[in-house]
């Protein structure tokens, strides 16, 4: 049964993908609601007017009096809760909520909840494939692919959800069967006052969780939990009790659980130490919800990774080209640089730059010095990255992605990797990170 009172009035704030899923959900349950968006022509406006012509919609500057007609506002993750109109409505007693809170109230099957600064999509997809291999009727989505409310179904046996900090801000009680924060590094500092505020938002994922998984090599991922709550860890160190990790025997490295070797690392199709960590995180989450190891390992052996996430493009003249356009923050770029750097004989020629979202790039310097032959810089905040790296390696500034790839080809030597891992968002030069990745792949594939 839907846990939503139908005699109250709601307003959906934000008419993008998640906003439209809220519209469909509320309409299907006969709830009275309206829609507001700060944009004059939001992405789903035509769809709303075609399918729900009776729904009142206000576009442009948010009207506080209009918002205060509602008992509850469902705020899309793209809109900051610090927006003055939202704060004014909250001060007058209007509840601020979101689609994930509504999803959690209505989901009947167990939820695997996954957040983190990086690798969320890879681990979410992997757990979904593990569940499918085990014969479960699984629904995968949230911040990845299908909006959460569109997944609700009585047929689903397990939900695997990727959740962003923005989605978690409006989620009071998720009540996941198992929850994890994979890693935490600076991201979205244009939306948060600092790392502590971002950390607090991420940790809302643990509210009401029945089990937790955390990264034992990243103290910021460890939740404050009560006694008796089942807890599993993952990391690249040797595992002990209730832990997943790496164990080496006779020169062979294995994914392992406690004191049991599960499979050789060389059987993974996904490259780099960061992807070994992702595999271990997925195993921990799957184990927590009772997935058998044979099904999980079968899924791991066939998983080739996701587009734009350390995606192999081609080998040319002894140089491998990788598209990691999804690396829109420093932590993601570091994972790729250090993960691939430990896995290759040569060096990395890195393409970096774009919209830095207020990040501090100083943490790039050491890993770049250790793993890179050169860095090709482009985009709005390329000078900030250049200042952070300093004289650690040669820096080459370019005006386009085409020029960046050409410089990489001229610089790289056999055994090297050319890596697009920008450490920045893409909106200064591209439609989105997918557009940036697709252009990179096209340019690389056109190299003679």
From Swiss-Prot:
Belongs to the MurCDEF family. The keyword Cell cycle applies. InterPro entries: Mur-like_cat_sf, Mur_ligase_C, Mur_ligase_C_dom_sf, Mur_ligase_cen, MurD. It is found in: Cytoplasm. ATP binds at residues 116-122. It catalyses: UDP-N-acetyl-alpha-D-muramoyl-L-alanine + D-glutamate + ATP = UDP-N-acetyl-alpha-D-muramoyl-L-alanyl-D-glutamate + ADP + phosphate + H(+). Keywords: ATP-binding, Cell cycle, Cell division, Cell shape, Cell wall biogenesis/degradation, Cytoplasm, Ligase, Nucleotide-binding, Peptidoglycan synthesis. One of its GO terms (molecular function) is UDP-N-acetylmuramoylalanine-D-glutamate ligase activity. SUPFAM superfamilies: MurCD N-terminal domain, MurD-like peptide ligases, catalytic domain, MurD-like peptide ligases, peptide-binding domain. GO terms for cellular component: cytoplasm. This is UDP-N-acetylmuramoylalanine--D-glutamate ligase. GO terms for biological process: cell division; cell wall organization; peptidoglycan biosynthetic process; regulation of cell shape. Its EC number is 6.3.2.9. Cell wall formation. Catalyzes the addition of glutamate to the nucleotide precursor UDP-N-acetylmuramoyl-L-alanine (UMA). Its main location: cytoplasm. The keyword Cell division applies. Pathway: Cell wall biogenesis; peptidoglycan biosynthesis. It comes from Pseudomonas fluorescens (strain ATCC BAA-477 / NRRL B-23932 / Pf-5).
């Amino acid at each position: 049964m839907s846990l939503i009172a139908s005699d109250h009035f709601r307003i959906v704030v934000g008419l993008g993908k998640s906003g439209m899923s809220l519209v469909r959900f509320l309409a299907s349950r006969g709830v009275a609601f309206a829609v507001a968006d700060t944009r004059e022509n939001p992405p789903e406006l035509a769809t709303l007017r075609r399918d729900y012509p009776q729904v009142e919609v206000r576009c442009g500057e948010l009207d506080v009096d209009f918002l205060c007609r509602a008992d509850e506002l469902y705020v899309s993750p793209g809109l900051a809760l610090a927006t003055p109109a939202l704060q004014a409505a909250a001060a007058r007693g209007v509840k601020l909520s979101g689609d994930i809170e509504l999803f959690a109230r209505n989901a009947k099957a167990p939820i695997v909840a996954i957040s983190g600064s990086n690798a969320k999509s890879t681990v979410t997809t992997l757990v979904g494939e593990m569940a499918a291999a085990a014969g479960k009727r699984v629904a995968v989505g949230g911040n990845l692919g299908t909006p959460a409310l569109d997944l609700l179904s009585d047929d689903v046996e397990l939900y695997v959800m990727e959740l962003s900090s923005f989605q978690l801000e409006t989620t009071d009680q998720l009540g996941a069967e198992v929850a994890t924060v994979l890693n935490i590094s600076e991201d979205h500092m244009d939306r948060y006052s600092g790392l502590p505020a971002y950390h607090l938002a991420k940790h809302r994922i643990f509210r009401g969780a029945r089990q937790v998984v955390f990264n034992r090599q990243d103290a910021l991922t460890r939740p404050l939990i009560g006694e008796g709550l089942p807890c599993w860890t993952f990391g690249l160190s040797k595992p002990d009790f209730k832990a997943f990790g790496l164990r080496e025997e006779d020169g062979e490295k294995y994914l392992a659980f406690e004191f049991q070797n599960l499979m050789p690392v060389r059987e993974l199709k996904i490259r780099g130490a960061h992807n070994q960590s992702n595999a271990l995180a997925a195993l921990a989450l799957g184990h927590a919800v009772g997935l058998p190891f044979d099904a999980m390992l079968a899924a791991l052996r066939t998983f080739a990774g996701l587009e734009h996430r350390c995606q192999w493009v081609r080998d040319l003249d002894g140089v491998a080209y990788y598209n990691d356009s999804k690396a829109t923050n420093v932590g993601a770029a570091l994972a790729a640089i250090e993960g691939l750097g430990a896995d290759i004989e040569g060096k990395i020629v890195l393409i970096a730059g774009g919209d830095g979202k207020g990040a501090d790039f100083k943490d790039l310097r050491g890993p770049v010095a250790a793993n890179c032959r050169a860095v090709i810089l482009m985009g709005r905040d390329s000078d900030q990255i250049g200042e952070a790296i300093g004289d650690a390696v040669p820096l080459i500034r370019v005006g386009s992605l085409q020029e960046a790839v050409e410089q990489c080809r001229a610089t790289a030597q056999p055994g090297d990797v050319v890596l697009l891992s920008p450490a920045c968002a893409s909106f200064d030069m591209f439609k989105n990170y997918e557009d940036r990745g697709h252009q990179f792949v096209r340019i690389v594939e056109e190299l003679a």
